[in-house]
């Protein structure tokens, strides 16, 4: 994988990530396609209507259903989903912990039961790489030991040592397999304890294709999260992409970009869309509310998304109230367009050395309805 930094504005970075299936401009937001698709959207929506280059799929879910070997026999995840961009797959460790009963954390992996049928499974650092090789992921995440916050210092220390050990095992295994098109990212843990974050970076070997800041947006305050990012990002290699996992709001994303983060994913735009919350540059609106019943204007004037060019808030209000499946698609198209345009505009501002003023202007307008 080739990552080229094109511009730096203070700490904000703009770059190019060259993957075998696509060239990705950073900062980048990755829509979350847990089951190999973005809920209610298909590959044509992602490619032609949203111009998405990189999306996230979940190793745990793909492994349990339909099975990574099924996907491999059908030509890999790209052919299976007919998505001609790139896929990042997470390790599945978080889902093994959060969705399963009777999870057992061991020094060499995670024992868990399927949330589908109760069958017993064992994820190890090499097992999750084998699954992701079968999926033919462009970017693969190592197995890590994620800790919810707040957590005792002893548990954080256990987590970072175990995560670093698993990451280093993964790196050596990946080198042995010689799979240059499947790039491997490490994950830095440590909660909001800055010394633990530094230790995590120090214990994790160099040589990964990228580095993720994990273990955030799991119960800490926004200030704690930003302080942790500000401390951790400068410790990571400057010539490698930096990925903040599972974050977040438009404000969070712009703050993290200003701290040197390049990549983001979150279910927020699509989950909020399905639950009637739509993003605009003047803040969020709830399309289910009565005032939109006779509102013949688009979600946002001057928005160029597929939905806003064709449909009114009144129509979307009706679809939501009628529980029509089409609502989820149209709302998700708008919210993802909003997020993808946000990082695209942030990138342009970095290239033009005006990111801080762009961020200030965006946040002033976006939050004005909360004053």
Curated annotation (Swiss-Prot):
GO cellular component: cytosol
Positions that bind Zn(2+): 303, 305, 308, 334
Biological processes per GO annotation: queuosine biosynthetic process; tRNA-guanine transglycosylation
Alphabetical list of Gene3D superfamilies matching this protein: Queuine tRNA-ribosyltransferase-like
Catalytic activity: 7-aminomethyl-7-carbaguanine + guanosine(34) in tRNA = 7-aminomethyl-7-carbaguanosine(34) in tRNA + guanine
Cofactor comment text: Binds 1 zinc ion per subunit.
Region (RNA binding): 246-252, 270-274
The keyword Transferase belongs to this UniProt entry's keyword annotation: yes
EC number(s) reported in the record: 2.4.2.29
tRNA processing in keyword set: yes
SUPFAM superfamilies: tRNA-guanine transglycosylase (SSF51713)
InterPro entries the record matches: TGT, TGT-like_sf, tRNA_ribo_trans-like
Listed pathway(s): tRNA modification; tRNA-queuosine biosynthesis
Cofactor: Zn(2+)
Record function comment: Catalyzes the base-exchange of a guanine (G) residue with the queuine precursor 7-aminomethyl-7-deazaguanine (PreQ1) at position 34 (anticodon wobble position) in tRNAs with GU(N) anticodons (tRNA-Asp, -Asn, -His and -Tyr). Catalysis occurs through a double-displacement mechanism. The nucleophile active site attacks the C1' of nucleotide 34 to detach the guanine base from the RNA, forming a covalent enzyme-RNA intermediate. The proton acceptor active site deprotonates the incoming PreQ1, allowing a nucleophilic attack on the C1' of the ribose to form the product.
PANTHER family according to UniProt: QUEUINE TRNA-RIBOSYLTRANSFERASE CATALYTIC SUBUNIT 1
Family: Belongs to the queuine tRNA-ribosyltransferase family.
Descriptive protein name: Queuine tRNA-ribosyltransferase
Organism of provenance: Helicobacter acinonychis (strain Sheeba)
């Amino acid at each position: 994988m080739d990552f080229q930094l094109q511009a730096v504005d203070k700490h904000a970075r703009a770059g190019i990530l060259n993957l075998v299936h696509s060239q990705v401009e950073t900062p980048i937001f990755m829509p979350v396609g847990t089951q190999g698709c973005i809920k209610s959207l298909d590959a044509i929506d992602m490619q032609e209507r949203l111009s998405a280059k990189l999306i996230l799929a979940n190793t745990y879910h793909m492994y349990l259903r339909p099975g990574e070997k099924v996907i491999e026999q059908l030509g890999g995840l790209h052919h299976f989903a007919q998505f001609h961009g790139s896929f990042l797959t997470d390790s599945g460790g978080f889902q093994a912990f959060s969705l399963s009963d009777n999870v057992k954390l061991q020094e060499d992996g995670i024992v868990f039961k399927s949330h589908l049928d109760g069958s017993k499974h064992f994820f190890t650092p090499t097992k999750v790489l084998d699954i992701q090789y079968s999926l033919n992921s462009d970017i693969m995440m190592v197995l890590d030991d994620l800790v919810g916050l707040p957590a005792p210092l002893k548990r954080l220390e256990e987590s970072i040592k175990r995560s670093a050990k698993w990451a280093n095992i993964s790196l050596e295994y990946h080198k042995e397999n010689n799979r240059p098109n499947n790039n491997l990212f490490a994950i830095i843990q440590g909660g909001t304890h800055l010394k633990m974050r530094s230790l995590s970076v120090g214990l994790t070997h160099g040589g990964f294709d990228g580095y993720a800041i994990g273990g955030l947006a799991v119960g800490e305050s926004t200030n704690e999260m930003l302080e942790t990012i500000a401390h951790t990002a400068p410790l990571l290699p400057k010539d490698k992409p930096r990925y903040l996992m599972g974050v977040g709001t438009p404000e969070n994303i712009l703050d993290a970009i200003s701290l040197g983060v390049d990549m983001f994913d979150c279910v927020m735009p699509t989950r909020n869309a399905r639950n009637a919350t739509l993003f605009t540059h003047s803040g969020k609106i709830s399309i289910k509310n009565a005032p939109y019943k006779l509102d013949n204007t688009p979600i946002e004037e001057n928005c160029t998304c597929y939905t806003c060019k064709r449909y009114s808030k009144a129509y979307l209000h009706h679809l939501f109230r009628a529980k029509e499946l089409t609502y989820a698609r149209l709302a998700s198209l708008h919210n993802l367009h909003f997020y993808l345009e946000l990082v695209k505009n942030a990138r342009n501002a970095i290239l033009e050395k005006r990111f801080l003023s762009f961020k200030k202007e965006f946040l002033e307008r976006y939050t004005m309805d909360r004053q």
